[in-house]
Amino acid sequence: MVDEKVIVDEVETRDAYRVAYVIHFLLGAGSLIPWNALITAVDYFGYLYPDKHVEKTFTVAYMSCSVLVLVLMMTWNTRMSYRVRMNLGFSMFIIAMMISPLIDWVWKGEKGENVSYMLMVGSVVLCGLADGVVGGSLIGSAGKLPRQYMQAIFAGTASSGIIISLLRIATKASLPQTPQGMRTSAHSYFIVSSTILLCCFISCNVLHKLPVMQQHLKFHQPLHSTLTIWMVGRKIKWPASGMLIIYSVTLSIFPGFIAENLKSQLLQSWYPILLITVYNISDFVGKSLTALYLWQSIKSATWACIVRLLFYPLFSACLRGPKWLRTEVPVVVLTFMLGLTNGYLTSVLMIMAPKTVHASEAELAAIFMVVFLGLGLVCGSVIGWLWLI
């Protein structure tokens, strides 16, 4: 099915005190903080725009723009350096994150305001564009580095979900459940998220000065010709297909189906927030497990991605099946497994795929994988929008 011969990592420059690892972890977290911030504030946006399918609209807008940028990065040989692209992306993230509180301060929490809703969707589009710039640059760069840096990035992306979920729970629980309390908690939530992104902005300017990154830049060779793109694509077509399936399944269920379709009389408005937190924790566990055990067979990992299609009938049973399945416990268990398998298989494929090609093609292979990850996100968000589960 696929050539499973893996090229051994090149000898790396010593990463003193694991600074480069920590920064890659932080940048991975920062790259997904805006997305997690938007979907975890589901209660706030549901209050402001009760007649809109906020989760599904945000997902399609964000993912479509991200994939567009990734495709352009893969096919167009940009002259912007890694550092410039990262600075641009995080600047766009910070601006987009501050739009939500600014909108609320101007309209003072008026519900159903169409102009504010369009501006909010515009900020989501800006986040999606920034995600493509940051994600493509960061993962493409890590594709040429030793495998622990790719693992650090994806562990970081998963940790961002936990950080944001806990932050949302803290801000929601610490203030009264009134319209004003909800607005104040959301303001604090987005401002703290922006502060974390500012730390990422500073860190990416430190990263390029480290010896391990100097080694990476020294051997950097742009290979973005059309011929090379498809040559590399053919070599990693199976892990890329696996990535497409992973995120088509995940995004068609999470967050839209979980946030909108599943209800709990016991937990009420806390239910979607707690389910999103469970998913984020299990996703982090899955992406961290590759530091302990890395599944070496890309063929087997790709088949495991196909097996995840079973989540469709299982979640459907939790919505329409027997009464005992339409309770909180089965949903929490399934959500945990959805996140765990998503995290582990993503990390395995993203670590292994760039190592199955020549070192000079590793960056392009990593970007190619991210493009298919993004295509999976778009497919999943569209399936979720069409209510096919």
UniProtKB/Swiss-Prot annotation:
The induction field says: By nitrogen deficiency and 5-fluorouracil plus methotrexate.
Q: Name one GO molecular function term.
A: nucleoside transmembrane transporter activity
State the tissue distribution.
Answer: Expressed in stems, flowers and siliques.
This protein's superkingdom? Eukaryota
The protein's topology relative to the membrane is: Multi-pass membrane protein
Decide whether keyword Cell membrane is in the record: yes
Keyword check for Cell membrane, yes or no: yes
Q: Coiled-coil stretches, from where to where?
A: none
* An annotated GO cellular component: plasma membrane
The UniProt keywords, alphabetically, are:
Cell membrane, Membrane, Transmembrane, Transmembrane helix, Transport
Q: Which residues cross the membrane?
A: 19-39, 57-77, 87-107, 119-139, 150-170, 187-207, 238-258, 266-286, 331-351, 367-387
Q: Where in the cell is it found?
A: Cell membrane
Q: Name one Pfam family in it.
A: Nucleoside_tran
UniProt family annotation: Belongs to the SLC29A/ENT transporter (TC 2.A.57) family.
Q: What does this protein do?
A: May be involved in nucleoside transport.
Q: What is the protein name stated in its UniProt record? A: Equilibrative nucleotide transporter 8
Source species, please?
A: Arabidopsis thaliana (Mouse-ear cress)
